[in-house]
Amino acid sequence: MAWTPPPPRTGHPYYMHDAIYAQPGALRLVTRGQEATFAAAAERLQAMERVLLSGIGTSWHATLVGELLFAHVGRLGHRVRAFHSFEFKNSWPEPDPRTGVVVVSHRGTKRFSLEALAKAKAGGGVAVVITGKGSGEGLAIADYTLRTVDQEASAAHTISYTCAMMLLAALAAEMGGADDVRHELEGIPDHLALLLGQEAWDDLAARFATRRCYYFIGGGPNTATALEAALKMNEASYAKTVGMNCEQFLHGPWAALEADDVVFVIAPPGPSYERCLAVARAAREVGAPVVALVREDDKEIAALAAETIAIPPVNELLSPLLTVVPLQLFTYHTALQRGANPDTMRADQPAHGRARASLAL
């Protein structure tokens, strides 16, 4: 049955707010009842010569995290690669029976994700879909379907993103027989519940609501967090925003940084930490304030930051399940500060509504 959006909200709490705070409960439940599908899909994917992950927008960002999870936790190594659905459809060679494809699509209606799935099926390999409940019928051709949550009422997707990452992590753990990761995943909802209550998010947003540009910088799996945070800021608060890998930022983009910008550095312990530290130092030299998402015992980046957000200690590959949520909340409260409706992606404004109708997504 086709999903019908609920009536729009015109004030706080918007639908985006409700979805953000529903994430701990959703993450606790998202794998339940799907154990047999996990086992069967994991066995088929592990037997493939290569595995490709595909998505668009927020779903593409989930696949970037999934790529590293499949490579390390799922023990696929160099046999896995993530693609934007548009590029997979148009630029990647035709899959063959030795190729497994995992398509992530919350709504199940985006043209190029559907075409990527059709291309995967035509190749004869295994096709797995990670999607929301009540998603489009075009995904029904997949061999295996893993469900996240009900369709999001807000156009700025949040809960479907973290639930998709949770399913990718659980699938990787199933492929790799990683009991330690399975155990750590069980603790993520409790970490997240504590994280949601630890900061005065409206005060943080009020402090930085009028900045010229927002930079979100991370490395490793949190490159995806940086990209996702920037996308959420575009969608929900309509702000000028950049999301980027830490090393990429240091190779030129830093030159555009000004003192009236703000730089969010997403830097849990890991191989990218030292380069994230270099980003924080550069921002401080320019005079741009740094907001650091770091572990609570961090000393170096925290010392350079105007604000710190403490991230619980978890496996770096799982950290995007936590690091993205404070940035979702910052985005939401920044939207309120800027007088934006975070649910509509400006479709309620005539010019942007006409632009949206012309996009043929």
Each language-model region and where it sits:
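Terminal amphipathic helices with adjacent charged low-complexity linkers/tails
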Residues: 2, 6-9, 167
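Active-site phosphate/pyrophosphate-binding segments
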Residues: 11, 15-52, 144-262, 272, ...
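Active-site-adjacent beta-strand anchor residues
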Residues: 20, 266, 320
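Glycine-rich phosphate-binding loops that contact phosphosugars or nucleotide phosphates
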Residues: 36, 43-194, 254, 266-313, ...
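Residues at the start of alpha-helices and the adjacent loop-to-helix junctions
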Residues: 112, 156, 221-222, 275, ...
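Composition- and surface-driven signal marking solvent-exposed, interaction-prone regions
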Residues: 229, 276-280, 323, 346
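Hydrophobic membrane-spanning alpha-helices of multi-pass integral membrane proteins
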Residues: 261-269, 324
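Internal helix-turn-beta structural module
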Residues: 308-310, 314-336, 340-342
